[in-house]
Amino acid sequence: MLDREGFRPNVGIILLNAHNEVFWGKRLREHSWQFPQGGIKYGETPVQAMYRELHEETGLLPEHVKVIGRTRDWLRYEVPDKFIKREVRGHYRGQKQIWFLLRMVGRDCDICLRATDHPEFDAWRWNEYWVPLDCVIEFKRDVYQLALTELSRFLRRPQPRTERPGGHHHGQRYPRMASSVNAPPGASMASSMTVTTVTTAIAVESTLRATIESDCSSTEDPAVQAPGLRD
């Protein structure tokens, strides 16, 4: 479903915890990180689409979150032609998004990346609200910055921590990584590549993924052809 200008209606989600840290998900079998987002289906309102995408991508239900705010208008980004299927070039231009700021009132263990048969993420982490966006695919960065900036007016004073920063396994900082492995938002990158560094990064990522799946066990845009870019 495209508008007259060739943009597909979409919702984006910035999910906060009590410390004003933001949820980031790692794209399935990729080394890029992003916020939950997805298309608005015919007949859906943006709010309905937001709750559906929230559950599909994070496993969270409406009772696990509180809506704090949303962008006043659509924010748009264009998808480069090389990522658009040939048969729709000239018609499809990109996405227009309403962004929602949510605060999580549930527990970290309520997050489950395998709530559906087609998960979007294979790892997740909490990170500071303001971080460099180098890990985000380039054509989405401006929209991320606009959404974060507009919605920052709703931020409140964070709750004091009961544990040291990074004490929770989902929020721990990754070690320095070689340039072939993208770090999570805000994490540092190694200046040179070594076999030990790459091995360590992969081992940490595998451990994080296994831990997430263990915790959760108890509790597509047709115009875009590149993996990880459909939403």
Curated annotation (Swiss-Prot):
Domain Nudix hydrolase: from-to ranges: 6-149
Transmembrane segments: none
Hydrolase as UniProt keyword: yes
Tree of life domain: Bacteria
Enzyme class: hydrolase
A GO term for molecular function: pyrophosphatase activity
Cofactor: a divalent metal cation
Motif Nudix box boundaries: 38-59
EC number(s) stated in the UniProt entry for this protein: 3.6.1.-
Chain intervals for the UniProt region annotation (Disordered): 157-190
NCBIfam families on file: PRK00714.1-2 (NF001935), PRK00714.1-4 (NF001937), PRK00714.1-5 (NF001938)
Stated role: Accelerates the degradation of transcripts by removing pyrophosphate from the 5'-end of triphosphorylated RNA, leading to a more labile monophosphorylated state that can stimulate subsequent ribonuclease cleavage.
Protein name: RNA pyrophosphohydrolase
Gene that encodes the chain: rppH
